[in-house]
Amino acid sequence: VPAFGQALLPHPLQLDSTQMEKTGLSIAEEAAQLARFRQYELALPRAELATQLAPKSFQTWALLGSLYIQTEELEKGVAALQQAQNLDPENASILFALGSARFQQENYAAAIQELQAGLKLKPNVPGALFDLGNAYYKLNQFPEAVAEYEKAYAQEKNFWPAINNIGLVNYEKGDIEGAIQRWKTAVSIDDKAAEPMLALAVALYTKGDQEQGLAMGEAALKLDNRYGDIEFLKENLWGERLLQDTQKFLETPRIQASLAQNQEAPTPPVMSP
């Protein structure tokens, strides 16, 4: 650049560390707002910039970690959350997020470790207790899973997923009646909850109450037709025994007709926990 041109260039801003951190936190808030509207592609570069401007702020790293996880970049997410945890070791929410990320990585033992550490700092958080139960469930540690689900339900009586998953455990252990009672309770809490409704339908149908089972199955799939997909059920921790019975149930002409009818229906939005 010739000398004249150089004279026209703006002087670089001399920001002190306090001003940089303030700017970083402001950008992080902007990224968080975008994330609330699920605009992750716009939020992510802002969150990355925020960690550069405010590298000693656990908030910026925690936000970046959560965004990486939302966009399924799990390794980057775990690394960012670990950085946040190093900056604020007593923050239970960061440990809970780490536990959730480890679960998604299928590292269930590490998930248990992170969640237990978080619960020591902040006990009786229903979502964390539920996640801990799920990690035990994936390791086939059923008594421990049920204990955590029961704790979660004790903390929040409307928390039907915990009761639902106790039903999943019951069914895999061959306690069909116990599973039916749990799923009935879950549906009584939320009569729009498609998962326990379909599980209950399958259990009733398999037990011999075919008419009630089919009618309930139709209602469940009308609420949310994703539950007609075996892979989706696996993601929701349905075990082998229940999946086998569900496969037979889904292949019945009446349920096949219901699935075809619902195929054109829009999928319900996924609600944030």
Go through each PLM region and give its residues:
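Terminal, low-structured helical/coil segments at or just beyond the last alpha-helical repeat
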Residues: A7-L15, A219-P273
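Alpha-helical segment of the N-proximal tetratricopeptide repeat
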Residues: M20-Q59, L63-E73, S100, Q104-N107, ...
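Helix-start (N-cap) detector for alpha-helical repeat units in TPR-like alpha-solenoids
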Residues: G24, F58-Q59, A92-S93, P126-G127, ...
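Structural signature of tandem alpha-helical TPR/SEL1-like repeats
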Residues: R36-R46, Q70-Q83, Q104-A117, K138-K151, ...
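Structural marker of alpha-solenoid helical repeat scaffolds
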Residues: L53, L87, L121, Q155-E156, ...
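Ligand/cofactor pocket segment of small-molecule handling proteins
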Residues: K122-K173
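TPR/TPR-like (Sel1-like) alpha-helical repeat modules
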Residues: K184, S188, A194, L198-D229, ...
